[in-house]
UniProtKB/Swiss-Prot annotation:
It comes from the Bacteria. The gene is idi. GO terms for cellular component: cytoplasm. It is found in: Cytoplasm. Belongs to the IPP isomerase type 1 family. HAMAP family: Idi. Residues 26-160 form the Nudix hydrolase domain. This is Isopentenyl-diphosphate Delta-isomerase. It is an enzyme of class 5 (isomerase). The active site is at residues 62, 110.
């Protein structure tokens, strides 16, 4: 199935096939979700079959809205599709932009709406194996330390979020050094 995502081509937002957006390094819309249980965040290891950054740890979920889809609706959809998570209230945290090489000649140049959702630590999670290899809860401070010590284990966008946008995403109470 061809997935059309909102991307800027010559300064105009228009539908572009997702893989083409990455091949051309086009600036495009995305969403990222962080599900939190207190100070712990649910992270996922991307499935081995993903066409970029397979096997790397990422935030709870992320994707690109379909052409015409609202970012908030997309966040809820991907929690359900990737992780089988329903019933959480996602709250818009911020919008950030980044550009990163994700290997195999592909570039993520994303304008990302970031959402945070609070959940119980015993939240039922049922990952789609086509999308997610495994999940785990990790304390945000420990995650920030792991990313600094072993950046090669994590997606470029998670490294960027934690290095450059902690306060904007998690608020002053959750900022770690």
């Amino acid at each position: 199935m061809t997935e059309m995502v909102p991307a800027w081509v010559e300064g105009r937002l228009m539908p572009v096939e997702k893989l083409e957006a990455h091949q051309r390094g086009l600036r495009h819309m995305a969403i990222s979700v962080f599900v939190m249980a207190g100070e712990a965040v649910l992270i996922q290891r991307r499935a081995a079959g993903k066409y970029h950054t397979p096997g790397l740890w990422a935030n709870t979920c992320c994707t690109h809205p379909r052409w015409g889809e609202e970012a908030a609706d997309c966040a809820v959809r991907r929690l359900r599709e990737e992780l089988g998570i329903t019933g959480l209230v996602t709250v818009f945290a911020d919008r950030v932009e980044y550009r990163a090489d994700v290997g195999n000649g592909l570039t993520e140049h994303e304008v990302v709406d970031i959402f945070v959702a609070e959940a119980p630590s015993d939240l039922p999670v049922n990952p789609d194996p086509e999308e997610v290899w495994e999940t785990r809860w990790v304390d945000l401070t420990d995650l920030a330390r792991e990313v600094k010590e072993h950046p090669e284990r994590f997606t470029p966008w998670l490294r960027i979020y934690l290095a450059e946008h902690m306060e904007r995403i998690f608020g002053k109470l959750r900022v770690v050094q």
